[in-house]
């Protein structure tokens, strides 16, 4: 039944792509034509993937790279308190590819543009925030990604760095998240609490009691369980949504370049 749904939705999305290509192809505008070429490259890249991709996104210093290090146990990944990721890097983990993206919400536009492009291309997104929660800037960026750009169907939220505060504050963290994601629920985004650094610290520990305590505090096993279930439940949806995300992104960019009312009318009738 799931496969039948996939075929049905895939055909509908293919028709949307064809309609989009036809409309853009009829516009005499060099910048629009250049954007159409970029768009086609992204569509080809997305359709030609042979691995399932999960992108880790969020503010800088939220611990995205640390989380990927904990999952892969690849100690060559650069981690730290400051901006350490300035490019997109892929890491193999089990049967999927984990994508480490630059932090958003900085004054480095090229970092944000790079992260947003891979949000479109990735099959699923893990949005990482810390126990400090959503300030106005982080909340604005999250809502833009999840709701304005329609990426919520392929997103989950992970709260990292739980060791910085008492777990007694978990209810407060959850209430903070609820305000931002409303009317969606914590369950919709599979909100998970972890401390990736504690897991890495456990790997250096020879005392079994301390090692186990750090592993429990990290909750990495809980995160992996949620992530696996997330892939099983949302994987097909995420792959379909990626094409729509790409179309939506280029639709906005091309609309900004269109100069005639007639061409704008064509696009509005499409969307």
PLM segments and residue spans:
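Structural beta-sheet core signal
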Residues: 56, 127, 157-159, 193, ...
């Amino acid at each position: 039944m799931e496969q039948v749904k996939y075929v049905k939705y895939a055909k509908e999305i293919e028709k949307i792509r064809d309609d989009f290509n036809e409309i853009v192809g009829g516009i005499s505008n060099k910048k629009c034509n250049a954007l159409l070429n970029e768009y086609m490259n992204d569509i080809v890249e997305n359709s030609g993937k042979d691995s399932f991709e999960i992108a880790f996104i969020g503010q800088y210093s939220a611990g995205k790279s640390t989380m990927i290090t904990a999952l892969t146990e690849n100690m060559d990944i650069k981690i730290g308190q400051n901006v350490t990721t300035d490019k997109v890097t892929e890491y193999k983990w089990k049967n999927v590819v984990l994508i480490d993206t630059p932090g958003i919400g900085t004054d480095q536009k090229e970092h944000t543009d790079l992260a947003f492009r891979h949000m479109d291309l990735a099959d699923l997104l893990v949005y990482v925030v810390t126990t400090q929660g959503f300030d106005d800037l982080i909340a604005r960026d999250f809502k833009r990604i999840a709701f304005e750009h329609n990426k919520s169907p392929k997103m989950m939220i992970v709260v990292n760095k739980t060791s910085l505060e008492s777990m007694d504050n978990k209810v407060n963290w959850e209430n903070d998240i609820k305000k931002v994601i409303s009317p969606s629920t914590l369950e919709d985004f599979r909100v998970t609490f972890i401390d990736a650094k504690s897991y890495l610290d456990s790997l250096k520990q020879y005392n079994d009691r301390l090692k186990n305590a750090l592993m429990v505090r990290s909750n990495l096993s809980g995160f992996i369980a949620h992530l696996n279930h997330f892939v099983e439940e949302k994987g097909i949806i995420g792959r379909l949504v990626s094409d729509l995300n790409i179309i939506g992104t280029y639709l906005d960019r091309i609309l900004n370049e269109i100069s005639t009312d007639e061409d704008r009318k064509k696009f509005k009738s499409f969307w």
